[in-house]
Amino acid sequence: MKRFLFFTIACLSSSWGMAQIATDTYVEVLYFHGKQRCATCKAIDKHTKEVVNVDLAELVKNGKLRFKEIDISTPEGEKLAEKYRVSWSSLYVNKWENGKEERNDMTRFGFQNARSNTTVFKKELKQKINRLLK
């Protein structure tokens, strides 16, 4: 009887842990780039990192926000670039909920604003991340 009870509790605990992982909601910011980057690409990189690591550091600490910098010239980066159909510098802000990804391509916005209108770029990026977490 003790073995049965232990087995049942172990199974339930295991199932509950899996359910927690499956319902995890977070935002993942992906910045793709090649070996050579223009001034605008560098601005997107710099200001995205500032938003994620400084302005929204608490979300990173809580696991609600993740950042990945992907060099598409590496074998590992090539695989991700193929998955996202990326062939040059790109910025994605994606929501993950219940194991499903909602992609948001912010590349055009980044190129329009990161270098020439930094304040707008950072403000909109923060707003996008916060909206996706609601």
Roles of regions detected by a PLM:
Residues 93-134:
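Non-catalytic, surface beta->alpha helical segment in thiol-disulfide oxidoreductase systems
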Residues 1-23:
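Bacterial Sec-dependent N-terminal signal peptides
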Residues 49, 53-57, 130-134:
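Sec-exported extracytoplasmic/periplasmic mature domains
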Residues 23-54:
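Local sequence-structure signature of Cys/Sec-based thiol-disulfide redox active-site neighborhoods
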Residues 34-41, 45, 74, 114-122:
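Solvent-exposed, acidic/flexible segments
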Residues 75-98, 105-107:
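Structural alpha/beta surface segment adjacent to cysteine/selenocysteine redox centers
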Residues 60-76:
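Thiol-based oxidoreductase modules, predominantly thioredoxin-like and allied folds used
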